[in-house]
Amino acid sequence: MPLAEGSTFAGFTIVRQLGSGGMGEVYLARHPRLPRQDALKVLRADVSADGEYRARFNREADAAASLWHPHIVAVHDRGEFDGQLWIDMDFVDGTDTVSLLRDRYPNGMPGPEVTEIITAVAEALDYAHERRLLHRDVKPANILIANPDSPDRRIMLADFGIAGWVDDPSGLTATNMTVGTVSYAAPEQLMGNELDGRADQYALAATAFHLLTGSPPFQHANPAVVISQHLSASPPAIGDRVPELTPLDPVFAKALAKQPKDRYQRCVDFARALGHRLGGAGDPDDTRVSQPVAVAAPAKRSLLRTAVIVPAVLAMLLVMAVAVTVREFQRADDERAAQPARTRTTTSAGTTTSVAPASTTRPAPTTPTTTGAADTATASPTAAVVAIGALCFPLGSTGTTKTGATAYCSTLQGTNTTIWSLTEDTVASPTVTATADPTEAPLPIEQESPIRVCMQQTGQTRRECREEIRRSNGWP
């Protein structure tokens, strides 16, 4: 249960909640002794209860607290109170790049602004790498901008020390990666292999791609498909998304290479090449060999956990991806065979509308053309048909339900899970009840909640919602 405003936790006075996710909540809180307000992150009790997790949390929080850099959100303190781990960080009064994309630049940010952001974050990452600390969760949501409309704005990277543990024994991080971080994670991180700074460089490049185009490099409603694309698909050419960015194609081809050895050795090398191609300073052919900093390997037991847990999760997701891919090819064949029948024409009040088959790719914008009495409008839909309650990303994208209603990729309250919803804001926890199916084993809450969201928003039965979500997610 979230902490109430005015309540006290570990000596901090809660001012208000700033956000929440699958691992806990973040609050604006008054420091117990100093005249300042901090960001207090409180982890859930079930997360905090894991002994190995707690030890790693304390170890990495201590390491993060040693970082002192103008572009890193500082960690001041950490502890445990009433069975919950907490960490005290700088409060950044401003926004994040996800909000900037949503509110100001839905089709991508200006090149000079992206260069400034990526350069600042690259410097922060290389500073941490030199001190043998990885971030492992670089993404737009973790890039904060203080005083965004002021000349003295600050760009800061958040969540060092508490984000992206790929060997999380509780499975929470792996679950989170399937719906969010997976859009930016390097192949070796998804496979649970040993990491160095080039994994963060990959994530930084994927983030830059998103900032420049308005969407991450690989997109699909099913996270399993995105994982398979990170592992095997060629890096997308950014010029195919935004033609004027074609000069950046070789930069992203290198930065998003599957093998770490083929990428830029340091994050600032990538930022320099990006800035040069966008018209800033830097050397596009900077091939100086800078040895990546190898982060100290964890104990053998942790490596074994990584080798077992992450590939196990990945194997399950890849099975899903194969099923989805086969289904997509079959559907594509069916559509090609029946293309004339799939284009339907309806006439109403002298207006003819041709509707092409739905596509998961982002088509070029279409402008209706009017021709007097026989007005004709031809439009290609910009969103795929989706199932309410099914997994989705990126956050803020839109789709169309089978009834023609607009669906929004929104966050399910109290989790990091993003699902299709008929409401644009955070999806409230469902209140509808459902009769248990005696033929089905009880589902975990993370699977049951989206089903009930579907029931509540669409009026369908539990079985109907479950089957639609199962098909959409590619589950067997």
From Swiss-Prot:
Ranges where the record places region Disordered: 332-376
UniProt keyword annotations, A-Z: ATP-binding, Kinase, Nucleotide-binding, Phosphoprotein, Serine/threonine-protein kinase, Transferase
Main EC class the enzyme belongs to: transferase
Pfam families reported for this sequence: Pkinase
Binding site for ATP: 18-26, 41
MF GO annotations: ATP binding; protein serine kinase activity; protein serine/threonine kinase activity
Active site: 137
Modified residue annotations for Phosphoserine: 290
Known catalytic reactions: L-seryl-[protein] + ATP = O-phospho-L-seryl-[protein] + ADP + H(+); L-threonyl-[protein] + ATP = O-phospho-L-threonyl-[protein] + ADP + H(+)
EC nos: 2.7.11.1
Superkingdom in the source lineage: Bacteria
Modified residues (Phosphothreonine): 8, 13, 173, 175, 287
Domain spans labelled Protein kinase: 12-279
Low complexity: compositionally biased ranges: 338-376
Family: Belongs to the protein kinase superfamily. Ser/Thr protein kinase family.
Name by which UniProt lists this protein: Serine/threonine-protein kinase PknF
